């Protein structure tokens, strides 16, 4: 649909990583990652990645930033640079203007994290699948959102596009609403209560009482935040330890 409209398809592949999905192989033009998350894997570095597939034609008349001379860079016309036009403009213009250059040490940390990407993601995915299946069996959990479950509307698509697994981020709803969500998170000891994802450690957050707490209940619902919504970013700890921690939280949350 993007190409029919004459615009590039840009995909944020942060959650899946290239190990699970390679968007360029499915027709995407540009892929972006927050390398802070699973690529680095340990929550120790801040960085981002832009991957230009080099297949989009910027000369369709809708992108003057690519087809007209850039007076700030000696009149360069980026579309004339061929396949890597987007990546080159990002390097010579956006990087210059925004200063978004990763530090050498952060680059080292991301590079080091990439060496274990496949091993980590395999463990993330296997743990997340077990957690999602566990949550579906709990009486005080009303629904679970995870594309690795047959009940998910995205299940078949996930099997086709991401046969190695559906990632490690899970959403679920506690029957007791906001108070149950607070009790659940506060009772956990293995999970870290933070807003991040993509760490080797298991992470949890209850959006209604944290990230979206300044919104009215109506505004929260408009943003897709229900009262008992909990988000898990499942880590690579032993699955028995993860499930034991979740059991304790669910027992404290009540019905």
Each language-model region and where it sits:
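Active-site beta-loop-alpha junctions enriched in small/polar residues
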Residues: 14-16, 149, 175, 235-237
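Residues that form or flank phosphate/diphosphate-binding pockets in enzymes
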Residues: 18, 179, 241
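Short glycine-enriched loop/turn motifs at secondary-structure junctions
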Residues: 43, 164-166, 225-228
């Amino acid at each position: 649909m993007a190409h029919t409209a004459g615009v590039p398809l840009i995909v944020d592949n942060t959650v899946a990583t290239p190990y699970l999905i390679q968007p360029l192989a499915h027709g995407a033009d540009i892929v972006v990652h927050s390398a802070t998350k699973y690529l680095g894997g340990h929550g120790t570095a801040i960085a981002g990645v832009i991957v230009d597939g080099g297949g989009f034609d910027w000369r369709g008349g809708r992108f003057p930033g690519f087809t007209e001379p850039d007076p700030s860079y000696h009149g360069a016309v980026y579309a004339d640079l061929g396949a890597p036009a987007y990546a080159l403009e990002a390097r010579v213009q956006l990087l210059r203007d925004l200063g978004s250059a990763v530090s050498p040490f952060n680059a080292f940390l991301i590079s080091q994290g990439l060496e274990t990407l496949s091993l980590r993601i395999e463990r993330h995915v296997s743990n997340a699948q077990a957690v999602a299946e566990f949550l579906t069996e709990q009486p005080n959990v009303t629904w679970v959102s995870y594309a690795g479950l047959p009940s998910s509307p995205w299940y078949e698509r996930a099997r086709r596009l991401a046969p190695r697994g559906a990632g490690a981020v899970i959403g679920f709803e506690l029957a007791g609403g906001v108070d149950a969500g607070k009790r659940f998170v506060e009772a956990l000891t293995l999970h870290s209560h933070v807003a991040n994802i993509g760490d080797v450690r298991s992470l949890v957050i209850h959006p209604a009482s944290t990230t979206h707490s300044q919104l009215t209940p109506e505004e929260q619902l408009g943003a897709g935040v229900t009262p008992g919504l909990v988000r898990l970013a499942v880590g690579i700890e032993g699955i028995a330890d993860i499930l034991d921690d979740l059991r304790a939280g669910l027992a404290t949350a009540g019905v």
